Amino acid sequence: MNPIVKQFKYGQHTVTLETGAIARQATAAVMASMDDTTVFVTVVAKKDVKEGQDFFPLTVNYQERTYAAGRIPGGFFKREGRPSEGETLIARLIDRPIRPLFPEGFYNEIQIVATVVSVNPQICPDLVAMIGASAALSLSGVPFNGPIGAARVGFIDDQFVLNPTMNEQKQSRLDLVVAGTDKAVLMVESEADVLTEEQMLAAVVFGHQQQQVVIDAIKEFTAEAGKPRWDWVAPEPNTALIEKVKAIAEARLGEAYRITEKQARYEQIDAIKADVIAQITAEVAEGEDISEGKIVDIFTALESQIVRSRIIAGEPRIDGRTVDTVRALDICTGVLPRTHGSAIFTRGETQALAVATLGTERDAQIIDELTGERSDHFLFHYNFPPYSVGETGMIGSPKRREIGHGRLAKRGVAAVMPTLAEFPYVVRVVSEITESNGSSSMASVCGASLALMDAGVPIKAAVAGIAMGLVKEDEKFVVLSDILGDEDHLGDMDFKVAGTRTGVTALQMDIKIEGITAEIMQIALNQAKSARLHILGVMEQAIPAPRADISDFAPRIYTMKIDPKKIKDVIGKGGATIRALTEETGTSIDIDDDGTVKIAAVDGNSAKEVMARIEDITAEVEAGAVYKGKVTRLADFGAFVSIVGNKEGLVHISQIAEERVEKVSDYLAVGQEVTVKVVEIDRQGRIRLTMKEVAPKQEHVDSVVADVAAEENA
């Protein structure tokens, strides 16, 4: 085995690509490394197309092995299970820029498997996996119009940083991943701390320029180690069939695409499609190979041609709007009475019901990653049920798309969330998509912002999101604001921007064609800003600022500080004290190592009671101070009295009364309340008490015992 190795410098890191030694039965395999973070990527491509296949079956699997970080998995089975949310998101990150680079009509099945086998805690494996997948596809010989490069861009001290380390990312105001070919950007995924449109565009351009090093290196690597290019030729278009479909459907489709209401339009289009299939199938000559799939493909291409040509010609869009008009907005807040915060955001035929829930720190999600555990205090979940598009379907665990859309919406809102110090709650937002016709993820951003404000979460600013589209024919192009589902499907770009009045918080871009210039992206960003400001204006009319107080049904969190040395006293032996406090008052208590105590309670009186009891437990006994106490036990030499914080002191027999006391039990009884003064606290912390001068003359024990018994029976 003679492995072929390509090594090059990429920013501050060294990238190594190796092939020829491992997984030699795969179509192509590459071991990609960046400073000790290593991802093994394989590509298997089938030579034959499955019969009846009418779409491109590309699958990307990304999997992290815990041995990569020198760890053994937790859980009963002690092995990796189904993909985590993070693994799913990285699989999508690999898929999105490579999918558009396969030619139209290529339906051979391809599976890419990226396995993280070694991890440097400072280098995230996602970029390494993307570079490895690009290299493996380039080596495989399949008709892939790559390679692609990938870059992460940070923004630290007003400077762009290429591929920042994990430590550098903590200081960065930007986390942007950009992928593209040598000619054009294909994908952007980013989260920002309210940067301007100009800064975001500059970051995309910077990342695309820097990744040319990767593209050049992969081209050299392919020249040395690549397999022969497949002699795949795109199938010749069936001109006669295309003309038949046009003759039957073109005029009727043109009319259908003037129906503005989605369901009515879809019914009309489905009826036309059924007619086309029925007519052509009936006319098929014996031995002629015309499948229903081919007819549908031509029909879809005709739909695309009609919609796109109208937009390029400057005609109104499908629903009658101009290119930069946002659909009608409708906003309601506080729609669910017992939730902590809720809102319904409707934009045309897209609608999101967003609900915010406040919880305590123990509700934080513990995420077990390769580099160790971390806790997440802001959770965002996106649900896309089939009824939202008028269909039936399975309902179960979230699909890849739901996970991806949820993460994008979370990125849009994360920059304006308060810190734990400012607002000591764990916050969960759930976006239920109840109607969908384009850009439900951006509706989720708007709905989440409204629900958080309704819940009284002190977000720094309202956030809105908008999806932009593009239709480009040769040198002519039109940028569309607030795209419909059809415009997304039939257009050349899906460009989503979320942000506040002052800047961008998230940007996601997927481009299906080459030739998108910085000029086009600048126009799209400017048009998106106008649309975003319009939406924010409507949102601010509905709820101008976060509510002054949280919901009556949300837990109130009260914070107090105690001496860290006293934490053990509040917890008690085996947790007995803190358990009694929570059970008796119906509160939950969290104590940090620095002595910060957080008490969560729906009822304010319960919280005040707990705080008073904790103050009592942690109070320092002072020499010379007078306290009320309770006799806990008697001895021949005196009585033990419990004072503040359940601390016991001894009243010596000589300190019980002014006169001589022969027998302690003649003066005191267990359970009796007495007033005592602290005489001394010795070096061992033992407390000496006296009842002289501070206590009234002690009565005879018979009356004392009677009083105690009466109290207990009361």
Swiss-Prot record:
Reported cofactor(s): Mg(2+)
Binding sites annotated in the UniProt record for Mg(2+): D488, D494
EC number: 2.7.7.8
Location of the protein in the cell: Cytoplasm
Keyword Metal-binding: yes
Class of the enzyme per the UniProt entry, highest EC level: transferase
Catalytic activity, as annotated: RNA(n+1) + phosphate = RNA(n) + a ribonucleoside 5'-diphosphate
Biological-process GO terms, alphabetical: mRNA catabolic process; RNA processing
UniProt-listed PROSITE patterns: KH_TYPE_1 (PS50084), S1 (PS50126)
Ranges in a coiled coil: none
Residue span(s) of domain KH: 555-614
Keyword vocabulary terms for this entry: Cytoplasm, Magnesium, Metal-binding, Nucleotidyltransferase, RNA-binding, Transferase
Gene3D superfamilies noted in UniProt: GHMP Kinase, N-terminal domain (3.30.230.70), K Homology domain, type 1 (3.30.1370.10), Nucleic acid-binding proteins (2.40.50.140)
Molecular-function annotations in GO: 3'-5'-RNA exonuclease activity; magnesium ion binding; polyribonucleotide nucleotidyltransferase activity; RNA binding
Domain S1 motif: 624-692
Principal location: cytoplasm
PANTHER family: POLYRIBONUCLEOTIDE NUCLEOTIDYLTRANSFERASE, POLYRIBONUCLEOTIDE NUCLEOTIDYLTRANSFERASE 1, MITOCHONDRIAL
Family membership: Belongs to the polyribonucleotide nucleotidyltransferase family.
Subunit structure comment from the entry: Component of the RNA degradosome, which is a multiprotein complex involved in RNA processing and mRNA degradation.
Function: Involved in mRNA degradation. Catalyzes the phosphorolysis of single-stranded polyribonucleotides processively in the 3'- to 5'-direction.
Listed name of the protein: Polyribonucleotide nucleotidyltransferase
